[in-house]
Design a protein with these regions (language model features):
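Extracellular/periplasmic metallocenter environments
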Residues: 128-174
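Bacterial N-terminal signal peptides that target proteins for export
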Residues: 20-32
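Beta-strand cores of secreted/periplasmic/IMS beta-sandwich domains, seen most often
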Residues: 65-89, 94-96, 140-149, 153-154, ...
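N-terminal edge beta-strand
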Residues: 48-74
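N-terminal amphipathic/basic-hydrophobic helices that include classical n-h-c signal peptides
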Residues: 1-23
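Extracytoplasmic/periplasmic copper-protein system
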Residues: 47-56, 97-119, 161-174
Length: 174
């Protein structure tokens, strides 16, 4: 019978301590390399293509910077209102557009009013948006990342009446 470290046909190696040590080291090294390669492969494939943005009664987004991996085909943003006030008093939405378009999008959104979630449905500058949420509510939107051009700067804003000057954030493509 062949032992754990013994090669068939060479029983002398089974009792040589140096051979046993080297053989164990080689097997351990191969197992370690295989394990590390499998882990590295998992990291390369797994991308986080979603995020949650929190808003509150103090007119804040947290975080105010969203990193979107270039490998993501679609990206989902969930807006969670952690405050207590109802949406009629302190509603928030999340609207994505080019950074240079945010002020215009906020103006036309405010004019669109509450029944349109403060987003003009004809405004082609809007890339994606959530509905308006009040305290304890959340809303999600998934969008095609092909709409985002590398090298262009993007941001997000709350277009609820009066919120856009302070409720802003930036998108970083990485």
């Amino acid at each position: 019978m062949v032992g754990l470290f013994e090669r068939a046909g060479d029983p002398k190696q089974a009792t040589d301590p140096m051979h046993i040590h080297i053989s164990m080291f080689k097997r351990f090294r191969h197992a370690l390399i295989a394990m590390l390669l499998s882990l590295a492969g998992g990291f390369a494939v797994a991308q986080d293509c979603a995020t949650t943005i929190e808003s509150d009664d103090a007119l804040r987004y947290a975080p105010n910077i969203i990193e979107i991996p270039l490998a993501c085909k679609t990206f989902t943003v969930t807006l969670k209102h952690t405050g207590r006030l109802p949406k009629l008093a302190m509603g928030h939405n999340w609207v994505l557009a080019k950074l240079s378009d945010l002020d215009g999008v906020a103006r036309t959104g405010m004019l669109a009013g509450a029944d349109k979630a403060y987003v003009d449905p004809k405004d082609t500058r809007v890339i994606a948006h959530t509905s308006v949420v009040g305290g304890g509510e959340s809303s999600s939107v998934a969008f095609d990342t092909a709409k985002l051009v590398r090298g262009e700067r993007y941001g997000f804003v709350c277009t609820f009446a009066g919120h856009s000057p302070v409720m802003r954030g930036e998108i970083v493509l990485k």
